[in-house]
Regions:
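UBC/E2-like fold recognition across ubiquitin and ubiquitin-like conjugation systems
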Residues: 1-130, 209-216
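Generic preference for flexible, low-structure residues
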Residues: 17-22, 163, 174-176
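Basic nucleic-acid-binding interfaces
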Residues: 116-138, 143-171, 214-216
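Long, compositionally biased interface segments
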Residues: 169, 173-216
Length: 216
């Protein structure tokens, strides 16, 4: 198990779409490639206020969002790449994700200007265009393979909310988990009391004992 704590934020905006998720993944990848993180071997000692990557049987990003020094939200999503912290190698299916490949993926995202094309064909065409424009045609296949994964992997989105403003009894509890981000699939699980990043990690950790829901 490795805990990689980032000293800089990896999410500049709320996560409301797959495009937002991809941006977070690519920003975290940037920091991993450039070694802009600290390694923590004891989760009890990790800074609750900083985003971190938990790497073990599961690989998940945990991203707290603070207002006036108080954590009001904690986002967690699956991290789809493999990272060897000892060798400083970021990869996907034996494809080495280096600065040039990650930069190409960021360029593709920026070209979309906030909206993904409707078809996979248009997306992949843009991947090839970016590689050709940057004299990186030799990385076309790698870019397409990694970007296809980003477009299709199971995001595993969970968000903890401390939401006093919209509190409405049991319909919208002050403390709750939002599962999934789209309006069609999201739902809430109410919490009796607030939790921190470590508690959310424990709830989602597949190597720890399960947590149980208790009906009212």
């Amino acid at each position: 198990m490795k805990l990689l704590s980032f000293t800089r934020n990896i999410a500049s905006n709320a996560i409301r779409s797959r495009l937002d998720v991809i941006k977070v993944i690519l920003q975290a990848s940037d920091y991993l490639i450039d070694k802009q993180y600290s390694v923590c071997h004891n989760i009890e000692k990790i800074d609750n206020n900083q985003p971190f990557l938990y790497v073990d049987k599961m690989s998940r990003l945990f991203i707290p969002e603070k207002t006036a020094g108080e954590i009001l939200k904690i986002y967690s999503i699956v991290f789809p790449f493999s990272y060897n912290a000892d060798q400083h190698v970021l990869s996907f299916n034996q494809i080495n994700i280096n600065n040039s490949l990650n930069s190409c993926m960021k360029t593709v995202i920026n070209v979309f200007d906030g909206v993904l094309p409707e078809t996979m064909e248009k997306i992949l065409d843009r991947c090839w265009d970016v590689c050709n424009d940057n004299d990186l045609s030799y990385q076309q296949d790698d870019l397409v393979a990694v970007f296809t994964e980003l477009l299709t992997f199971d995001i595993g989105y969970v968000r903890y909310d401390y939401d006093k403003e919209h509190q409405n009894g049991d319909m919208h509890p002050t403390y709750h988990l939002d599962i999934n981000y789209s309006n069609q699939s999201t739902y809430k699980i109410g919490l009796i009391q607030p939790i921190d990043t470590l508690r959310l990690e424990a709830i989602l950790d597949t190597k720890q004992e399960c947590w149980f829901l208790k009906a009212n």
